[in-house]
Amino acid sequence: MITTMRRHATTLALFAAFTTAVTAVVNMLTEPTISHQAMLQQKMLLDQVVPAELYNSDMQKECYVVTNPALGSSAPHRVFIARQDGEPVAAALESTAPDGYSGAIRLLVGADFHGKVLGVRVTEHHETPGLGDKIEVRISDWITRFSGQTVQSEQDARWAVKKEGGMFDQFTGATITPRAVINSVKRSALYLQTLPSQINTLSACGENQ
């Protein structure tokens, strides 16, 4: 009886060790593929907010961490720098619209350093399906209306929904969502105007994290 129990215990231990080893090997083999896919998805997103013809550097390799109230929260946000022949010409900035209808809306805002927005994409949100989710490019082209628009100053009243005197459409039955996104993009573009002088002082992504 005792011998049989020991044999079963040994078998279970060997099976557990084998399973653990197989899992480790599978993780080791799939991790590079998952990482590669994540990099490809990131590159596609960056290309949507900063046109590739504007720069000849590798944006993914120049990533910094920034913290500023203008970005919508006290959490660190990443910014990717685009350079043309070594000179910074634009950036893609992670930003947060904290006042969405159903919570925070995460954005990626591409802009040059003179207030011109190059592109915007929503990376995460919890807005109401059929109403606030029109901020998604797969559902509506509304988010593309920012491309080419310039923020002249913090007092630029054009950066509002049309019912409030601005130049951007609101959604039927949903004004809070577009207002939150508009304000976040505006703040991000204004912040990016100050960035070139700070680049040499920023921490690279991955440092102290």
Curated annotation (Swiss-Prot):
User: One MF term in GO for this entry?
Assistant: electron transfer activity
Q: Which UniProt keywords apply?
A: Cell inner membrane, Cell membrane, Electron transport, Flavoprotein, FMN, Membrane, Phosphoprotein, Translocase, Transmembrane, Transmembrane helix, Transport
Source domain of life:
Bacteria
Which E.C. number(s) belong to this protein?
A: 7.-.-.-
Q: Does the keyword Phosphoprotein apply?
A: yes
What's its top-level EC category? translocase
Output the Gene Ontology cellular-component terms. Answer: plasma membrane
Transmembrane helix is among the record's keywords: yes
Question: Family assignment?
Answer: Belongs to the RnfG family.
Q: What is this protein called?
A: Ion-translocating oxidoreductase complex subunit G
At the highest ranks, the source species' classification is: Bacteria, Pseudomonadati, Pseudomonadota, Gammaproteobacteria, Enterobacterales
